[in-house]
Amino acid sequence: MSTCPHVTESHVFDFTAFLRDVCTDMIARLPELKHIELSRVAFSFVRSRKRTSHGTQATLTPMRFEGGASSGIVDGQRLTVDPLRTVDGREVLYLFHAYVPRFLDLSCEEKLVTILHELWHISPQFNGDLRRFPGRNYVHSNSEAAYDRLMLEFAQRWRAQEPNQQLLEVLSLDSARLQERYGRVVGHRIAMPRLVPVG
Protein backbone atom coordinates (compact mmCIF):
# COMPACT_ATOMS: atom_id res chain seq x y z
CA MET A 1 0.00 0.00 0.00
CA SER A 2 1.23 3.51 -0.84
CA THR A 3 1.46 6.06 1.96
CA CYS A 4 -1.51 8.41 1.89
CA PRO A 5 -2.95 10.62 4.67
CA HIS A 6 -6.48 9.44 3.79
CA VAL A 7 -5.70 5.75 4.40
CA THR A 8 -6.46 4.40 7.88
CA GLU A 9 -4.51 1.75 9.76
CA SER A 10 -7.03 -0.84 8.58
CA HIS A 11 -6.17 0.05 4.96
CA VAL A 12 -9.38 1.75 3.95
CA PHE A 13 -9.48 5.02 1.99
CA ASP A 14 -11.49 7.82 3.64
CA PHE A 15 -13.11 9.33 0.56
CA THR A 16 -15.10 12.09 2.28
CA ALA A 17 -11.98 13.31 4.14
CA PHE A 18 -10.15 13.36 0.81
CA LEU A 19 -12.97 15.29 -0.88
CA ARG A 20 -12.94 17.87 1.92
CA ASP A 21 -9.17 18.32 1.51
CA VAL A 22 -9.55 18.91 -2.24
CA CYS A 23 -12.22 21.54 -1.57
CA THR A 24 -10.06 23.15 1.14
CA ASP A 25 -7.20 23.50 -1.34
CA MET A 26 -9.50 24.91 -4.03
CA ILE A 27 -10.94 27.52 -1.68
CA ALA A 28 -7.45 28.57 -0.57
CA ARG A 29 -6.31 29.12 -4.18
CA LEU A 30 -9.43 30.46 -5.94
CA PRO A 31 -10.63 33.87 -4.66
CA GLU A 32 -14.10 33.25 -6.16
CA LEU A 33 -14.62 30.58 -3.49
CA LYS A 34 -13.39 32.55 -0.47
CA HIS A 35 -16.95 32.96 0.86
CA ILE A 36 -17.25 29.23 1.58
CA GLU A 37 -16.80 28.15 5.20
CA LEU A 38 -16.12 24.44 4.88
CA SER A 39 -16.62 23.79 8.59
CA ARG A 40 -20.34 24.24 7.88
CA VAL A 41 -20.42 21.99 4.81
CA ALA A 42 -20.98 18.26 5.38
CA PHE A 43 -19.53 15.70 2.96
CA SER A 44 -21.15 12.36 2.26
CA PHE A 45 -20.94 9.60 -0.29
CA VAL A 46 -23.69 7.56 -1.86
CA ARG A 47 -23.23 4.17 -3.50
CA SER A 48 -24.21 4.37 -7.18
CA ARG A 49 -26.84 1.78 -7.98
CA LYS A 50 -25.34 1.06 -11.40
CA ARG A 51 -21.74 1.16 -12.59
CA THR A 52 -22.38 3.44 -15.55
CA SER A 53 -20.83 6.74 -16.61
CA HIS A 54 -24.31 8.26 -16.96
CA GLY A 55 -26.28 9.71 -14.10
CA THR A 56 -25.65 11.95 -11.11
CA GLN A 57 -22.02 12.24 -9.99
CA ALA A 58 -22.50 14.73 -7.15
CA THR A 59 -25.12 17.02 -5.61
CA LEU A 60 -25.14 20.02 -3.31
CA THR A 61 -28.16 20.32 -1.01
CA PRO A 62 -28.90 23.71 0.60
CA MET A 63 -30.14 23.43 4.18
CA ARG A 64 -32.14 26.67 4.08
CA PHE A 65 -34.58 28.35 1.74
CA GLU A 66 -34.40 31.40 -0.54
CA GLY A 67 -32.42 34.22 0.98
CA GLY A 68 -31.27 31.98 3.82
CA ALA A 69 -34.75 31.76 5.36
CA SER A 70 -35.21 28.97 7.90
CA SER A 71 -38.54 27.96 6.34
CA GLY A 72 -40.39 28.23 3.05
CA ILE A 73 -43.65 27.38 1.32
CA VAL A 74 -43.64 24.06 -0.56
CA ASP A 75 -46.88 22.89 -2.20
CA GLY A 76 -48.85 25.32 -0.07
CA GLN A 77 -47.34 24.20 3.23
CA ARG A 78 -44.71 25.98 5.31
CA LEU A 79 -41.78 23.63 5.82
CA THR A 80 -38.33 23.71 7.35
CA VAL A 81 -35.33 21.42 6.91
CA ASP A 82 -34.59 18.87 9.62
CA PRO A 83 -31.33 20.39 10.96
CA LEU A 84 -27.91 18.81 10.65
CA ARG A 85 -25.19 19.90 13.07
CA THR A 86 -21.42 19.68 13.30
CA VAL A 87 -19.75 17.85 16.18
CA ASP A 88 -19.45 21.17 18.03
CA GLY A 89 -23.15 21.93 17.58
CA ARG A 90 -23.00 24.43 14.72
CA GLU A 91 -25.67 24.32 12.02
CA VAL A 92 -24.61 22.71 8.75
CA LEU A 93 -25.62 24.95 5.84
CA TYR A 94 -24.82 22.68 2.89
CA LEU A 95 -24.60 18.95 2.23
CA PHE A 96 -22.26 17.72 -0.52
CA HIS A 97 -23.01 14.19 -1.79
CA ALA A 98 -20.70 12.33 -4.18
CA TYR A 99 -21.88 9.17 -5.92
CA VAL A 100 -19.34 6.33 -5.76
CA PRO A 101 -17.99 4.66 -7.87
CA ARG A 102 -19.54 6.82 -10.62
CA PHE A 103 -17.69 9.95 -9.48
CA LEU A 104 -14.41 8.06 -9.08
CA ASP A 105 -14.61 6.72 -12.63
CA LEU A 106 -14.59 10.21 -14.14
CA SER A 107 -11.37 11.61 -15.57
CA CYS A 108 -9.31 13.91 -13.34
CA GLU A 109 -10.56 16.97 -15.24
CA GLU A 110 -14.18 15.80 -15.01
CA LYS A 111 -13.81 15.26 -11.26
CA LEU A 112 -12.47 18.79 -10.81
CA VAL A 113 -15.26 20.34 -12.89
CA THR A 114 -17.86 18.30 -10.96
CA ILE A 115 -16.53 19.42 -7.56
CA LEU A 116 -16.36 23.06 -8.64
CA HIS A 117 -19.82 22.82 -10.22
CA GLU A 118 -21.27 21.92 -6.82
CA LEU A 119 -19.20 24.43 -4.83
CA TRP A 120 -20.30 27.23 -7.18
CA HIS A 121 -23.93 26.52 -6.22
CA ILE A 122 -23.15 27.86 -2.73
CA SER A 123 -24.61 31.35 -2.27
CA PRO A 124 -22.07 34.21 -2.21
CA GLN A 125 -23.74 35.18 1.10
CA PHE A 126 -23.06 31.67 2.47
CA ASN A 127 -26.50 31.68 4.07
CA GLY A 128 -27.66 28.12 3.38
CA ASP A 129 -29.35 29.06 0.09
CA LEU A 130 -28.18 28.42 -3.48
CA ARG A 131 -26.45 30.93 -5.73
CA ARG A 132 -29.38 32.30 -7.72
CA PHE A 133 -29.18 33.57 -11.30
CA PRO A 134 -31.74 35.82 -13.02
CA GLY A 135 -34.36 34.11 -15.17
CA ARG A 136 -36.26 30.85 -15.05
CA ASN A 137 -33.19 28.64 -14.66
CA TYR A 138 -31.97 30.30 -11.48
CA VAL A 139 -29.71 27.35 -10.55
CA HIS A 140 -27.44 27.19 -13.64
CA SER A 141 -28.20 30.55 -15.33
CA ASN A 142 -29.65 30.66 -18.84
CA SER A 143 -26.75 28.55 -20.16
CA GLU A 144 -25.61 25.48 -18.27
CA ALA A 145 -22.87 25.07 -20.91
CA ALA A 146 -21.51 28.52 -20.01
CA TYR A 147 -21.73 27.56 -16.32
CA ASP A 148 -19.59 24.47 -16.93
CA ARG A 149 -17.12 26.40 -19.11
CA LEU A 150 -16.54 28.67 -16.14
CA MET A 151 -15.98 25.61 -13.92
CA LEU A 152 -13.42 24.29 -16.42
CA GLU A 153 -11.65 27.66 -16.29
CA PHE A 154 -11.57 27.46 -12.49
CA ALA A 155 -10.20 23.90 -12.67
CA GLN A 156 -7.44 24.94 -15.05
CA ARG A 157 -6.50 27.91 -12.86
CA TRP A 158 -6.37 25.66 -9.80
CA ARG A 159 -4.11 23.14 -11.52
CA ALA A 160 -1.85 25.93 -12.83
CA GLN A 161 -1.08 26.89 -9.22
CA GLU A 162 0.57 23.51 -8.63
CA PRO A 163 -1.65 22.26 -5.80
CA ASN A 164 -0.78 19.29 -3.59
CA GLN A 165 0.43 16.63 -6.00
CA GLN A 166 -0.96 13.80 -3.90
CA LEU A 167 -4.45 15.22 -4.36
CA LEU A 168 -3.95 15.25 -8.12
CA GLU A 169 -2.49 11.76 -8.06
CA VAL A 170 -5.56 10.36 -6.30
CA LEU A 171 -7.91 12.32 -8.57
CA SER A 172 -6.28 10.66 -11.58
CA LEU A 173 -7.21 7.15 -10.33
CA ASP A 174 -10.44 5.40 -11.25
CA SER A 175 -12.30 3.36 -8.61
CA ALA A 176 -10.55 0.07 -9.42
CA ARG A 177 -7.05 1.57 -9.34
CA LEU A 178 -7.85 3.54 -6.19
CA GLN A 179 -8.90 0.40 -4.31
CA GLU A 180 -5.95 -1.55 -5.68
CA ARG A 181 -3.53 1.06 -4.39
CA TYR A 182 -5.15 2.21 -1.13
CA GLY A 183 -7.84 -0.27 -0.13
CA ARG A 184 -11.59 -0.22 0.34
CA VAL A 185 -13.30 3.16 -0.13
CA VAL A 186 -15.25 4.39 2.91
CA GLY A 187 -16.53 7.69 4.26
CA HIS A 188 -19.41 9.47 5.95
CA ARG A 189 -22.85 8.53 4.71
CA ILE A 190 -25.48 11.13 5.52
CA ALA A 191 -29.12 10.78 4.53
CA MET A 192 -30.78 13.52 2.52
CA PRO A 193 -32.38 15.99 4.98
CA ARG A 194 -36.12 15.76 5.57
CA LEU A 195 -38.55 18.60 5.06
CA VAL A 196 -40.78 18.89 8.13
CA PRO A 197 -43.83 21.10 8.82
CA VAL A 198 -43.17 24.23 10.85
CA GLY A 199 -44.78 23.98 14.27
Enumerate the predicted regions with their spans.
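Metalloprotease/metallohydrolase-associated module, dominated by Zn2+-dependent proteases
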Residues: S2-V92, F96-H97, Q125-G199
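Generic "edge-of-domain/loop-turn" microfeature
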Residues: K50, F103-D105, H121
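Short pre-active-site segment immediately N-terminal to the catalytic Zn-binding motif
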Residues: H97-T114
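Short, well-structured alpha-helical patches and their helix-loop capping segments
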Residues: S107-K111, E118, V139, S143, ...
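"Short basic amphipathic alpha-helical interaction patches in structured regions
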Residues: E110-L116, L130-P134
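Active-site recognition of the HExxH zinc-binding catalytic motif
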Residues: V113-Q125
